[in-house]
Amino acid sequence: DVSSEVEVLKALKSLFEHHKALDEKVRERLRAALERVTTLEEQLAGAHQQVSALQQGAGIRDGVAEEEETVDLGPKRLWKDDTGRVEELQGLLEKQNYELSQARERLVTLSATVTELEEDLGTARRDLIKSEELSGKHQRDLREALAQKEDMEERITTLEKRYLAAQREATSIHDLNDKLENELANKESLHRQCEEKARHLQELLEVAEQKLQQTMRKAETLPEVEAELSQRIAALTKAEERHGNIEEHLRQLEGQLEEKNQELARVRQREKMNEDHNKRLSDTVDRLLSESNERLQLHLKERMAALEEKGRLSEEIEKLRQEVDQLKGRGGPFVDGIHSRSHVGSTTDVRFSLSTAAHVPPGLHRRYTALREESAKDWKPAPLPGVLAATTTPALTVTLRSPMWTRMSLGAWWALRLMSSHLVAILDAQTLAMMLQEQLDAINQEIRMIQEEKESTELRAEEIETRVTSGSMEALNLTQLRKRGSIPTSLTALSLASASPPLSGRSTPKLTSRSAAQDLDRMGVMTLPSDLRKHRRKLLSPVSREENREDKATIKCETSPPSSPRTLRLEKLGHPTLSQEEGKSALEGQDSNPSSSNSSQDSLHKGAKRKGIKSSIGRLFGKKEKGRLIHLSRDATGHVLLTDSELSLQEPMVPAKLGTQAEKDRRLKKKHQLLEDARRKGMPFAQWDGPTVVSWLELWVGMPAWYVAACRANVKSGAIMSALSDTEIQREIGISNALHRLKLRLAIQEMVSLTSPSAPPTSRTSSGNVWVTHEEMETLATSTKTDSEEGSWAQTLAYGDMNHEWIGNEWLPSLGLPQYRSYFMECLVDARMLDHLTKKDLRVHLKMVDSFHRTSLQYGIMCLKRLNYDRKELEKRREESQHEIKDVLVWTNDQVVHWVQSIGLRDYAGNLHESGVHGALLALDENFDHNTLALVLQIPTQNTQARQVMEREFNNLLALGTDRKLDDGEEKVFRRAPSWRKRFRPRDHHSGGMLGTSAETLPAGFRVSTLGPLQPPPAPPNKIMPEAHSHYLYGHMLSAFRD
């Protein structure tokens, strides 16, 4: 195999490099040895010279001494000194001779090693040459095989073409034969029909002759016949009128049926999305649980190993204690002095020299150090009164010369330190085992709860699917929902329905009887903890369990939002007598998992030992607000309220109930009345009460139902709402999605500015109402406003008719970006948020990673700015430019596709779907020319005719339908006229984005970068070349989206 040969070659290459490196090291060592030998030989030669010189000098002195008989004592001493030096030099010479012999032996050894390495290197080179030859052979075989494969593919292609041609001919022959047979059958049938018609005409002729005779006989009664005929004509006219009315009624019924079918398709799509999110949620929960379980098991293993190590240390301590006792008996006064100084409080860290440190066992030192660090880090116990005083004394320097005294003192010191640390650490071992066991039990119980929640979610999905497919919703009536409105899941938060926490942080609230549990169900309490759910299962009978199971299937997960950490604070306030151990374990549980801030309420009842695994559940609840089923919630007075979406779903359930529509209208009218009263009184937003704020969130902002329920429980006035920062919105209301928080913050800021007494009148229209729904907008469009303050409440910046439904279902498809619809709907992006989306928001939350698509979205936003976010004006201009080339700025993606088809490029028009090409991009983007459009259409470069047609028609389109003009230069690049820049001057960050208010009115948590406007792209001096991208070869980005 080629891959195995390549791996062999790589291995041989690495082996060759390794041998080469070894060879270099050996040569360096050889060179150093040779230098050392040379030095030693030089030193030896010098020593020989000195010895010879000294010997000559000694001989001369001896001759002089023989001639002179009188010798002084001074020359004798000099001769003795020279003799001692000669002996010293001879010893040095012998030492150097010995070193030289050793160097020569080492040189011989290194030479042998070099020889072996050279032989290995030669072998490796031969193997490498063989491998290269084998690789070349395999490559030649591979090229031959590829050539044979190409020949076979060409033959197969030729045979396939012949087969297709023969098949087409056979098909055409069969079609012709069938056509002729059909024509023959038609002719025969026509012939028979003509014969039958002739016979029928003959019979009619005979009948007519008979009638003629009868008519001639009845000619006298003609006036009576005429009167009867006139009566029949009048009756026929009335019947035709009734028939026309019936046809019109049928058309209306067909329209309603089509609307219902569309609504059913949307419901099915929402259910499919909910199933996907449930699946992702369950996968995330399982992964988090498995990781947490693994971490705890590993922690338990480490702790058990530490306990075993401590047991072994205790045994060693016993041995050392016996040794210390023996040393005390032999030590004498020195050891007694050390112990006396130790008890007085003089030493704990002994500094000793290197010679004395050699007597300390290294393993014992490591175990002691680890034990001391672990004890100091994990346990931190209080000092015991009976422990030896050696643990609290400063340093002592011990310098000992005798090995026996050194062993005795160090042994006593180690025994003292190990005994003290072991006595401190062994006290918490059993407590640690109990804590770990409790954590494992909590994790196992959490896993069981999650599995039960998954089963209940599957039951809900199946029940919803059966109800949607069958179309019978009669089983869900209001009476049953009021009797059974509980959701027995741990996803609900106690703070949404109750203002007081349970009485104990560790105990579980218990119901005294079955009737009490049923009373809770009737009242619509949807926030029972999971521990309470277990007691309810024990109390309720099997019949009531079946009823609860049916009720669970009818209520979506969206009705039970994740609890906020506010319940944790309530828990802490309610239990000031929590033990220190519980508080410590709670802090450890929180620090170990930062994502557990949204943990459920029942985890607090376990002493905060379980990790919060529901932090990602909030993603499930922001998908689609229209897909909510029945949701019972309680307001501050305790009354059961139903939202608009619930009532709209209840309408087709029971046809016999006529009060549902009236109830819906009454509640909707009441909510609109609250907002209308606040508008007419001119009340600032800070003075609004809780019901008005909740109605504003539900009717105008369009927040999901469980967000509204969270605000109903936590926000009691407009002042509280306007003072919420970004972190407080996430913590108090439980909105984890950053874009959901941005939506709410922008709505709050806009309302604060609109209701401010110093707010300027709006510029879009002098008559309008930001508080009306889409239906009321149509009915109130022609009505006159009598209030003088109506202008300040216009829908200039409200965008009530441009909510996230319009953005996802109409605006994004008009830009050619329908593939991002689900992400925009999930993040509840409305027109108010468009000008505040950053590049990070588009990439992370909206999954718009294509730079060309972000550019397309930005020019779509610029188009809305030019129209002052007027939806009716946009639709009007699009309708006017439907059948002619004008006002390209408002063209949709479908209109651009139709224009491409009309210029004769129908084959390439399909490539514009989901491309992001729309009229605003053509009219405003100076870098978008005919070459870029040809790249998007995927017109081949060799098709010059199609590209010429595209260039000519594109220039005509820009000249007739846009403000871009053609430069006089050679490149003929279209550029915008300078007039539009005056209309789009960059605004400073203090303008408050689209709302036009001061940034000082923002709450504390507002981000200026988020609320800052997106600047229009500056005109570059040179044309930006298109860049290769995942979908298209065009990718320049706006400056506001650059990092």
UniProtKB/Swiss-Prot annotation:
It is found in: Cytoplasm; Cell surface. SUPFAM superfamilies: SAM/Pointed domain. Residues 688-754, 803-867, 891-960 form the SAM domain. This is Liprin-alpha-4. Belongs to the liprin family. Liprin-alpha subfamily. The modification Phosphoserine is found at S500, S541. Residues 544-555 have a biased composition (Basic and acidic residues). Residues 24-332, 426-470, 864-890 form a coiled coil. Residues 590-602 have a biased composition (Low complexity). It comes from Rattus norvegicus. CDD domains: SAM_liprin-alpha1_2_3_4_repeat1 (cd09562), SAM_liprin-alpha1_2_3_4_repeat2 (cd09565), SAM_liprin-alpha1_2_3_4_repeat3 (cd09568). One of its GO terms (cellular component) is parallel fiber to Purkinje cell synapse. Forms homodimers and heterodimers with liprins-alpha and liprins-beta. Interacts with the second PTPase domain of PTPRD, PTPRF and PTPRS. Interacts with RIMS1 and RIMS2. Interacts with GIT1 and GIT2. Interacts with GRIP1. Interacts with KIF1A. Residues 498-617 are annotated as: Disordered. One of its GO terms (biological process) is synapse organization. PANTHER family: LAR INTERACTING PROTEIN LIP -RELATED PROTEIN, LIPRIN-ALPHA-4. It comes from the Eukaryota. Keywords: Coiled coil, Cytoplasm, Phosphoprotein, Repeat. The N-terminal coiled coil regions mediate homodimerization preferentially and heterodimerization type alpha/alpha. The C-terminal, non-coiled coil regions mediate heterodimerization type alpha/beta and interaction with PTPRD, PTPRF and PTPRS. InterPro entries: Liprin, Liprin-alpha_SAM_rpt_1, Liprin-alpha_SAM_rpt_2, Liprin-alpha_SAM_rpt_3, SAM, SAM/pointed_sf. May regulate the disassembly of focal adhesions. May localize receptor-like tyrosine phosphatases type 2A at specific sites on the plasma membrane, possibly regulating their interaction with the extracellular environment and their association with substrates. Residues 505-516 have a biased composition (Polar residues). Pfam families: SAM_1 (PF00536), SAM_2 (PF07647). PROSITE patterns: SAM_DOMAIN.
